[in-house]
A protein has these predicted regions:
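C-terminal beta-signal and adjacent terminal beta-strands/loops
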Residues: 48-49, 106-109, 115, 243-286, ...
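Residues that define the transmembrane beta-barrel architecture of outer-membrane proteins
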Residues: 20-24, 77-81, 155-159, 221-225, ...
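Residue-level signature of outer-membrane beta-barrel architecture
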Residues: 22, 32-33, 46, 75, ...
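Membrane-embedded beta-barrel scaffold of Gram-negative outer-membrane proteins
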Residues: 33, 39-43, 74-145, 155-157
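Extracellular loop and loop/strand-boundary signature of outer-membrane beta-barrel proteins
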Residues: 8-17, 66-71, 145-150, 210-215, ...
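Gram-negative outer-membrane beta-barrel transporters
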Residues: 93, 101-106, 125-254
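Transmembrane beta-strands of outer-membrane beta-barrel pores
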Residues: 2-8, 44-50, 57-59, 87-89, ...
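Surface-exposed extracellular loop regions of Gram-negative outer-membrane beta-barrel proteins
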Residues: 1-14, 21-27, 163-165, 172-181, ...
């Protein structure tokens, strides 16, 4: 079977005299049953998204970090294609489903946030010495925060493999499982042109797009693996979550610069970062990130007991190995945590 959606609005594309963009999009999908418990699927979809009110107009401070408006932000558009195969299986007391899929997504004017320094008087990012002088002569002061902007072009593609099912030991004893692996290649399609442009920068306060010259988008990881196991025996449940992720590929330039410095000498922005983020016992944000931005694995365990049909208790330990890790600068994950939960159903 197949399904195709295509929408067209036959109306005046103006609201209160303001022109509203008209963007038809095509979406198509195909599902085919090849055999018992064997399915092939394919899909293609175009997308068009106008900036939200938050991205375009909001000015707010959250815990000392500001969100700054950008009225020049443009709508993002793109398309996504996916091809997948799902297969059911049964081996004795074991039964489940295996799913394999490949995906490709392309964006134009992709909307992403960028951290930086801002003039609180005019909500403008400080991007040069003249911007800094304008901020100092004004009365608004400065703030650190994020502003949404457009990335010219981005391509994200990869594959996902997952399986889930159950092993029945007997009527009262079961093992449920869910395993998944995702490989993602998050490409900045214009990174060469951007790097060439940034090499011409002469103003020491001019902001670059990200912390390195790589071809990757910010705040992405290539590899993710997750496993969930739940062993049930009558009213008792013993479960475990295991997750493994690869390192973050790039972050914002305001936080650190991973590029090689000429003659190893610090630049003006290095001193700005020292003033903004400080250090503890000689450990700066950059040195901490270099040490902890690595592949990492976490383990959570839980023990649950269903006392009655209406009342259940669960004891959980998150980050069992007390792993210190960080998926982005200034965001250290919680240490080992113990929790007790009671569920009551009325």
């Amino acid at each position: 079977n197949y399904r195709i959606n295509n929408h067209y609005r036959e109306a005046e594309t103006k609201i209160f005299g303001t022109k509203v963009p008209f963007r038809p999009v095509l979406r198509a999908g195909l599902n085919c049953q090849l055999a018992d418990y064997s399915f092939l699927r394919a899909s293609f979809g175009q997308g068009y998204r106008n900036p939200s009110v938050v991205e375009k107009y909001l000015r707010k401070d959250i815990g000392g970090v500001g969100v700054y408006p950008n009225e020049n932000i443009r709508a993002e558009k793109g398309f996504n294609a996916e091809l997948g195969f799902k297969q059911g299986y049964k081996l004795g007391n074991l039964q489940g489903m295996l799913d394999v899929a490949g995906f490709y997504t392309e964006y134009k004017d992709m909307i992403e946030f960028q951290f930086g320094l801002f003039n609180n008087g005019n909500n403008k990012m400080i991007n040069s010495i003249s911007d800094a002088v304008e901020m100092l002569l004004g009365q608004g002061g400065f703030g650190i925060g994020a502003q949404f902007h457009n990335v010219s072009k981005a391509r994200i593609y990869g594959m996902e493999v997952s399986t889930n099912g159950v092993y029945n030991f007997n009527k009262n004893t079961k093992l449920y499982y869910n395993l998944g692996y995702v490989y993602t290649e998050p490409r900045d399609a214009d990174y060469k042109e951007r790097n060439a442009l940034e090499d011409t920068y002469t103003d020491p306060l001019q902001m670059k797009e990200k912390s390195n010259n790589s071809k990757y988008l910010k705040y992405r990881q290539k590899h993710t693996f997750k496993t969930t196991l739940d062993f049930e025996w009558k009213r008792i449940n013993l479960g475990m979550n295991v997750a493994w992720r690869s390192k973050t590929l790039a972050v914002d330039y305001i936080m650190l610069d991973e590029r090689e410095k000429p003659n190893g000498n610090p630049e003006v922005m290095d001193y700005v970062r020292s003033l903004l983020f400080g250090s503890i016992d000689g450990e700066t944000l950059a040195t901490y990130w270099k040490k902890h931005n690595t592949d990492y694995a976490t383990v959570d365990i839980r023990l649950g007991v269903k006392a009655t049909k209406e009342v259940a208790f669960q004891f959980m330990v998150n980050n069992l190995l007390n792993k210190e890790y960080s998926s982005r600068p200034m965001s250290v994950a919680a240490p080992r945590t113990f929790m007790v939960k009671m569920d009551v159903t009325f």
